[in-house]
């Protein structure tokens, strides 16, 4: 079979299926999505999978944690010998630079974690013996993924390491440090890691830069920025954790983050306020249009229904009202829930 395999947050399969269908149609490639709610993945079946993968960049996909090109689907695998059918399915393939054996991040998929770990240890030497895997990881060569959907059902897929998530299952394993004011700190940590390339992070998040955090209390996002030695104006009527203020990099203004504006242009504005997504999109657009910030990261809380429609509407609204040339990326991060995180950078 041929198609794209994309992992997602369980429950958001319809949104990912809609996104893949719309984006594939836009680039002129026919196909259809195969999925069930809470599976934690979507299989987009199409004849031109490699061409579609090249046109749908991983960082530009909103609801996909990972993007892979399927090369085979194996059903009815004998649990006593899973290696032989996999080697047969890979006959004629080029040598891979790495192997990841995975499972969906779902209630049905998580019990397969033990199988994935143990089978990876068995498959790796067999692939090397067959000349299908390099002796050491080679990131410049395609990466082989074996995704178990059940003990006797697996998808074989390939990833371009330059255009895919660099973490198994597409999940960055971030540790919540004891001094973090709230779990929301993980959202901004992941956003900086996922939405920006390493080169962009080095260029755009530098010590001495100035930022605003709207709706900052208790200070999770502010704290993440101070760890990058960024000076932060934290705007919230609520209190910040004392140790955040003690960094010497934070000015706490007790004000409404929705109405406050800076006296001078800032390098960054970040916002994780619980508010209607269209209202947030409009306010964020005002910040960009008025030149109050050069770059921004903000969250949009999605409704329970028509989440893909609301996502498109809010992003279109933001870009139209910003009235500037922008590079916009959006992602439902692992640490997001019913929301997406948006990055906008001035061109």
Swiss-Prot record:
Record's keyword annotation contains Secreted: no
Subcellular localization(s) per the UniProt record: Cytoplasm
Record's keyword annotation contains Cell inner membrane: no
Binding site for S-adenosyl-L-methionine: 184, 217-220, 236, 256, 272
The EC number(s) this enzyme carries: 2.1.1.186
Alphabetic keyword roster: Cytoplasm, Methyltransferase, rRNA processing, S-adenosyl-L-methionine, Transferase
Catalytic activity: cytidine(2498) in 23S rRNA + S-adenosyl-L-methionine = 2'-O-methylcytidine(2498) in 23S rRNA + S-adenosyl-L-homocysteine + H(+)
Broad enzyme group: transferase
Entry-linked Pfam families: FtsJ, RlmM_FDX, RLMM_N
Positions of the catalytic residues: 301 (proton acceptor)
Molecular-function annotations in GO: S-adenosylmethionine-dependent methyltransferase activity
Top-rank lineage group of the source organism: Bacteria
Alphabetical list of Gene3D superfamilies matching this protein: 3.30.2300.20, 3.30.70.2810, Vaccinia Virus protein VP39
GO cellular component terms, semicolon-separated: cytoplasm
Primary location recorded for the protein, binned into one broad class: cytoplasm
BP term (GO), one: rRNA processing
PANTHER family to which the protein is assigned, alphabetical: RIBOSOMAL RNA LARGE SUBUNIT METHYLTRANSFERASE M, RIBOSOMAL RNA METHYLTRANSFERASE FTSJ DOMAIN-CONTAINING PROTEIN
Subunit-level organization: Monomer.
Function: Catalyzes the 2'-O-methylation at nucleotide C2498 in 23S rRNA.
Family to which the UniProt record says this protein belongs: Belongs to the class I-like SAM-binding methyltransferase superfamily. RNA methyltransferase RlmE family. RlmM subfamily.
Protein's name in the database: Ribosomal RNA large subunit methyltransferase M
Species per Swiss-Prot/TrEMBL record: Xanthomonas axonopodis pv. citri (strain 306)
Gene: rlmM
């Amino acid at each position: 079979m041929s198609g794209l395999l994309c992992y997602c947050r369980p429950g958001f399969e319809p949104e990912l299926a809609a996104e893949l269908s719309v984006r594939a149609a836009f680039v002129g490639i026919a196909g259809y999505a195969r999925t069930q709610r809470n599976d934690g993945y979507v299989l987009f079946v199409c004849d031109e999978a490699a061409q579609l993968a090249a046109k749908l960049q991983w960082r530009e996909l909103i609801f996909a944690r990972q993007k892979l090109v399927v090369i085979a689907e194996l059903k009815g695998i004998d649990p006593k010998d899973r290696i032989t059918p996999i080697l047969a399915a890979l006959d004629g393939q080029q040598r891979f630079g790495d192997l990841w054996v995975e499972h969906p991040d779902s209630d049905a998929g998580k019990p397969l974690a033990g199988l994935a770990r143990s089978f990876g240890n068995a498959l790796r030497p067999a692939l090397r013996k067959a000349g299908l895997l390099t002796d050491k990881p080679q990131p410049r060569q395609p990466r082989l993924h074996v995704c178990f959907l059940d003990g006797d059902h697996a998808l074989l897929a390939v990833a371009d390491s330059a255009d895919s998530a660099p973490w198994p299952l597409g999940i960055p394993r971030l540790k919540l440090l004891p001094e973090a004011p709230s779990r929301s700190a993980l959202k901004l940590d992941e956003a900086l890691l996922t939405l920006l390339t390493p080169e962009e992070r080095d260029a755009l998040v530098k010590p001495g830069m100035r930022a605003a955090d709207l709706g900052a209390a208790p200070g999770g996002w502010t704290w993440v920025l101070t760890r990058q030695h960024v000076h932060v104006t934290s705007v919230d009527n609520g209190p910040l954790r004392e140790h955040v203020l003690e960094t010497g990099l934070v000015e706490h203004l007790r004000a409404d983050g929705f109405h406050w504006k800076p006296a001078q242009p800032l390098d960054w504005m970040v916002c994780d306020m619980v508010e209607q997504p269209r209202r947030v999109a409009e306010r964020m657009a005002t910040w960009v249009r008025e030149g109050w910030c050069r770059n921004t990261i903000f969250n949009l809380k999605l409704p329970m229904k028509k989440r893909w429609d609301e996502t498109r509407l809010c992003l279109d609204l933001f870009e139209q009202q910003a009235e500037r040339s922008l590079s916009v990326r959006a992602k439902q991060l692992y640490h997001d829930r019913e929301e997406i995180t948006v990055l906008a950078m001035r061109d």
